[in-house]
């Protein structure tokens, strides 16, 4: 039996409703509750998670910097487990350059994300949006793309506009696994992977499967196609905890990804589980 490779979790959400407002959570009852550092630390220790990054949780726009302040506190309290943060941003706003300048003074901020999968398609097509994302060139800050399968073409357009920005595609492109979406998603992934400045995050895809009936063979084609498109050196792993609770939870997702990669070489497993992420963010 192979020894378990340590995991670096590139996609962790902390939910502190006593400190921040999360407008979208009122629509998702299963997630509309606190998820605090202590909850995660207990699971991480048991599951072999050796490090993690906090991913922004789409807080109210006025509280973006407040979320960063909270995460800085959590990093200090995590005993070295939490290594940095991907912060929220609004590239469609004229004050984005000011936010970027502020972010470069915060050693804990390693990148940005702007939620797109629940926004009008036109948002990422705006010239101001694209030019502001392009400002990340040379900064060392990454940009996470959270788009639906049908929006992969829009993601490709943005990536093309910003050839010197390192992009991260979240959640294998958010395929509708429960609905059986595959061919259109697969073509979009193949095309997007042709761009050298984007890598794919295999994170929490169990949340998009049938929560009551999914099995390994339901998510296997999506994981395998993602790796086939991007290669073993351009994929990273993330939990998407606690959103992965919609498909069974952190422990279930870790067990699933270990099972899906059981036939991989030790080197390829290490690349997915921690080495590629550590190289992207130099951590």
What are these regions (language model features)?
Residues 62-81, 165-169, 219-228, 251-260:
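Short, electropositive alpha-helical surface patch
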């Amino acid at each position: 039996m192979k020894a378990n490779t340590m995991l670096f979790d590139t996609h962790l959400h902390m939910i502190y409703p006593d400190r921040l407002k999360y407008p979208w959570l009122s629509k998702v009852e299963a997630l509309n509750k606190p998820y605090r550092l202590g909850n995660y630390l207990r699971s991480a220790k048991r599951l072999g998670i050796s490090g993690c990054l906090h991913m922004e949780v789409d807080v109210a726009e006025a509280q973006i910097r407040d979320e960063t302040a909270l995460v800085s506190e959590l990093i200090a309290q995590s005993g070295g487990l939490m290594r940095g943060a991907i912060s929220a941003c609004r590239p469609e706003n004229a004050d984005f350059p000011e936010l970027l300048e502020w972010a470069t003074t915060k050693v804990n901020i390693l990148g940005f994300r702007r939620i797109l999968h629940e926004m009008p398609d036109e948002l990422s097509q705006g010239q101001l949006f694209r030019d502001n994302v392009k400002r990340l060139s040379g900064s060392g800050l990454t940009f996470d793309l959270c788009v639906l399968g049908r929006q992969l073409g829009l993601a490709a357009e943005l990536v093309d506009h910003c050839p010197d920005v390192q992009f991260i595609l979240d959640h294998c492109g958010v395929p509708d696994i429960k609905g059986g979406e595959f061919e259109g998603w697969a073509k979009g992934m193949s095309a997007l992977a042709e761009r050298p400045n984007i890598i794919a995050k295999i994170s929490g895809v169990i949340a998009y499967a049938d929560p009551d009936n999914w099995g390994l063979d339901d998510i296997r084609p999506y994981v395998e196609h993602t790796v086939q498109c991007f290669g073993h050196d351009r994929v990273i792993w993330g939990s998407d905890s606690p959103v992965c609770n919609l498909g069974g939870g952190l422990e279930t997702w870790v067990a699933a990804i270990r099972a899906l990669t059981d036939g991989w070489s030790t080197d390829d497993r290490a690349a997915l589980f921690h080495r590629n992420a550590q190289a992207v963010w130099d951590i």
